[in-house]
Regions:
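N-terminal small/glycine-rich loop or linker at the start of catalytic domains
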Residues: 1-5, 61-72, 104-107
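Active-site-proximal loop/turn and secondary-structure-junction residues that shape catalytic pockets
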Residues: 10-12, 34-36, 68-71, 104-108, ...
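Active-site acidic/histidine proton-transfer and metal-coordination neighborhood
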Residues: 13-18, 56-57, 73-168, 177, ...
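Short beta-strand segments at enzyme active-site cores
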Residues: 31-32, 63-66, 98-104, 136-141, ...
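Glycine-rich, proline-tolerant flexible connector loops at the mouths of alpha/beta enzymes
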Residues: 32-55, 105-111
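Catalytic-core regions built around general acid/base machinery
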Residues: 47-57, 123-130, 186, 221-225
């Protein structure tokens, strides 16, 4: 069964508005990337306590921490990133989730990713070891311009690190924007490692982000295959319909509603079970 979630900061910086829209959409989970205009990794203890109270009052749960870990250059110092990871791990524990989204480091422009393979593996291995110690699962997202931006390098990274604490999340739109056919070229390679999906779609011709099922992301095929295989996990809406950037995106309440409608329609068409 699929469980719907979403990046609530795509709705508004305001927690109250985020929770109101999620309630109106009957979405019971959120992926925490930022709130009150502050990135999740930078929230202080008082903010986390306030957030936890509000979630408890509304019955909304945290599906994952949409962290920025690994969204730095591969040659940037690692110790500060490990310290941020420790803080994110504390926040994940406080908010009751074991899943943390991560990235595999930006490659310097013009350089072949393979040149940095071992450094990426070593760095991701250090993050995975920390995750193992904290009982977390790192869900690696296939972001553009990082080492793991195409299916082959995503699979290579996960197998090379060799930790059950490092798994994959699947972002069809990002694959499209990297010139990949997500289902035809990516699903088979990554299915053994998939624990989570970021839901957005994109047009291959322009890279424009569109609602699920309205682009070239082959989401219908992927969702059908996952349902047929008995996948149990989250589908996290990340619409990017009003604004998309390297470190996040925005859709507004109306855009988020359009994205949620599109995903529900797609799920109904595939006869998948979801809630």
């Amino acid at each position: 069964m699929f469980i719907l979630s979403g990046f609530a900061d795509e709705i508004s910086p305001s927690l109250d508005e985020q929770l109101a829209v999620l309630g109106a959409e009957s979405i019971s989970h959120l992926e925490l990337r930022s709130v009150w205009g502050t990135n999740v990794a930078d929230l202080d203890d008082m903010q986390i306590a306030s957030l936890r109270r509000a979630l408890g009052e509304t019955g909304v749960h945290v599906s994952a921490i949409g962290s920025p870990i690994g969204k730095i250059r591969v040659d940037a110092p690692l110790p500060p990133e490990l310290e941020r990871m420790r803080r994110v791990a504390d926040i994940a524990r406080e908010l009751g989730t074991a899943i943390v989204r991560v990235f595999s480091f930006f490659i310097p422009p013009g350089e072949p990713p393979e040149r940095h393979r071992q450094r990426v593996i070593d760095r991701m291995g250090a993050l995975a070891q920390l995750a193992e110690e904290r009982g977390l699962i790192l869900a690696h997202e296939n972001e553009k311009e990082i080492y793991g931006d195409i299916p082959q390098r995503c699979a290579d990274l996960i197998t090379a690190v060799g930790s059950l604490a490092l798994r994959a999340t699947f972002d069809a739109a990002n694959f499209v924007q990297c010139g990949v056919q997500p289902h035809a070229e990516g699903y088979g390679l990554l299915r053994p490692y998939l624990v989570y999906l970021q839901i957005k779609d994109a047009l291959a011709a322009t890279g424009e982000v569109v609602p699920a099922g309205q682009g070239d992301g082959q989401l219908r095929e992927t969702l059908t295959a996952l349902a047929d295989s008995g996948f149990e996990g989250y589908l996290s809406l990340e619409p990017h319909l009003a604004q998309a950037g390297r470190y996040g995106g925005f859709s507004g309440p109306e855009g988020f509603h359009r994205a949620a409608q599109a995903l529900r329609s797609l799920l109904d068409d595939t006869a998948a079970r979801w809630r």
